[in-house]
UniProtKB/Swiss-Prot annotation:
Higher taxonomy: Bacteria, Pseudomonadati, Chlamydiota, Chlamydiia, Chlamydiales
Identification of the protein by name: Elongation factor Ts
Keyword Cytoplasm: yes
Region (Involved in Mg(2+) ion dislocation from EF-Tu): 80-83
Record CDD domains: UBA_EF-Ts
The gene coding this protein: tsf
Annotated InterPro entries: EF-Ts_dimer_sf (IPR036402), Transl_elong_EFTs/EF1B (IPR001816), Transl_elong_EFTs/EF1B_dimer (IPR014039), Transl_elong_Ts_CS (IPR018101), UBA-like_sf (IPR009060)
């Protein structure tokens, strides 16, 4: 005969998210004591998590949030797409976003030993281990990003494919252009720019592009070569620089043109301060 009630079993499952059989075993081991059973399962979780750490994690989700505390972006990987869409896993990821906003940290190593916002009795790494036990797969917090936010900034977030790709755009100079920032973020996910503007293209990347173009126009007069290089570089900048790209929702205007229009209508100098584009595994 069991030494615990069905109500205790139900509470243990609710508190830990662990399966029925393991909860029964834990309560039997702890003589029906709920608190001890919770601790027992957490210890088991830490032990079983270490056995899963070597497994590949190619699936996952990217999540982001922006509020008065700042902007946080996290990428968390698991083994299968099935678990990537699991409610327990998604709750863990959402909690991580809150943790980054609360602690204002910018590295995974700095985040892991901090107290979890989801369970004050656990560190974030310990909660990761407990969640691994619940979902049965390795969980890896791959990268995090925290951006402070001023009162004169607008932040727009766009998520594609249920968190497979996420973009964040920060506009400086104005606090009420979240819709524009989100439109630009949507454009970024579709167009995938590498740099903000011409000036941010690394010199070595620019030289490589010039060499490629030059090799294609050998034998022509230098004046012709220079004109061709100039034209092709313009196309190159349109391909890789956000501000040079034609807006995906209205190709008649560039992203720079959108920002310039925002400056005119707001009476402030609006600029794209920063953008982020993360894709799972990239």
């Amino acid at each position: 005969m069991s030494n615990f009630s069905m109500e205790t079993l139900k509470l243990l499952r609710q508190q830990t998210g662990v399966g029925l059989t393991k909860c029964k075993e834990a309560l039997a081991e702890c003589n029906g004591n709920l608190e001890e059973a919770v601790v027992h399962l957490r210890k088991l979780g830490l032990a079983s998590a270490s056995k899963k750490e070597h497994r590949e994690t190619k699936e996952g989700v990217i999540a982001a949030k922006s509020d008065a505390r700042g902007t946080a972006v996290v990428e968390v990987n698991v083994e299968t797409d099935f678990v990537a869409n699991n409610a327990v896993f998604r709750t863990f990821v959402d909690g991580l976003v809150e943790d980054v906003l609360n602690h204002k940290v910018n590295s995974v190593d700095a985040l892991l030993p901090l107290t979890s916002s989801q369970d004050a009795s656990l560190t974030i790494d310990e909660l990761r281990a407990v969640t691994m036990q619940t979902v049965g797969e390795n969980i890896r917090i791959s990268r995090i990003k925290y951006l402070p936010k001023t009162t004169e900034e607008s932040v727009g977030i766009y998520s594609h494919g249920n968190g497979k790709a996420v973009s964040v755009t920060v506009l400086s100079g104005v606090a009420d252009k979240e819709s524009l920032a989100k439109d630009i973020s949507m454009h970024i996910v579709a167009a995938q720019p590498l740099f903000l503007n011409k000036e941010s293209v690394p010199a070595d990347a620019l030289e490589r592009e010039k060499e490629v173009i030059s090799s294609q126009v050998q034998g022509k007069p230098q004046a012709v070569i220079d004109k061709i290089i100039s034209g092709k570089l313009g196309t190159f900048f349109q391909d890789v620089c956000l501000l040079e790209q034609a807006f995906i929702k209205n190709p008649d205007i560039t992203i720079q043109g959108l920002v310039d229009d925002a400056s005119k209508t707001s009476g402030n100098s609006v600029e794209v301060k920063e953008f982020i584009l993360w894709k799972i595994g990239a």
